[in-house]
């Protein structure tokens, strides 16, 4: 089976297969939307092109290619919001999609991309180089509740055992260590406050944070940032996980909650839910920054 995988996920062969499938999609089963291996491109409305290199373990790449980048998460809002931003922190950058999109849309922006996992880090660096981007600073550390060294858990992909780099996106700092084939590695950690104090990139306008369940631990140690800079924070809010912890942190600094829905950003009084309503991301907005997103509020 490994020989078969090596064949269809050879970048050149994969390009031919997916191009053919895309043309025949109207008459083919949806299950034939194969994972992507190698390079693919994203083109914005102004004709600017973004190159992304990936492998078949990246679910993000699969969605971007088959569904279109404007249909991925909150991309349609992000590309308009990022044009107003001077400093963007991408915490849990993975292969760099949002960092790359940010520089494509805003050539004057400063981007700090954090990625401690070795597989995503490899492709993040490669994608920045492929696009000849100069404004993305890559940090191979994990933001955490303390400074030092921790065990970071990466997934060893059993299906594609021959691959060196896994992009499953579930690497984490200890929030998930069971029921999957996790391998621990040592990574350097910094608190958010300490990192920003040491690096001093200026006031942060926007933070996107997706760290597989440790977001609240990172943000607990971002009190100086949240109280003084008041950045917009886009955070994954999966049902029945850390919603209460996130809500408590942001309420302390008078933030408002805007859930991302298919129609836009919907203001809610609480992000804690009794049942899963399908919301996966929340925009945490301080009232002083509402002008950044007022066009998207429904």
For the regions a protein language model found, what residue spans apply to each?
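Conserved acidic-Pro-Pro-aromatic motif
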Residues: 39-40, 106-113, 191-298
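S-adenosyl-L-methionine
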Residues: 1-117, 122-127, 131-133, 177-181, ...
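Short N-terminal helix/helix-N-cap motif within the alpha/beta-hydrolase-1
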Residues: 97-100, 122, 148, 216-220
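Short internal loop-to-helix segment that lines adenine-nucleotide cofactor pockets
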Residues: 66-87, 151, 166-229, 241-242
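Conserved SAM-binding strand-loop segment of SAM-dependent methyltransferases
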Residues: 133-140
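Canonical radical SAM enzyme core domain
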Residues: 117-123, 144, 239-242
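Conserved acidic residues
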Residues: 142-145, 191
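Polar, low-complexity loop segments and adjacent catalytic/binding residues used for recognizing
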Residues: 148-158
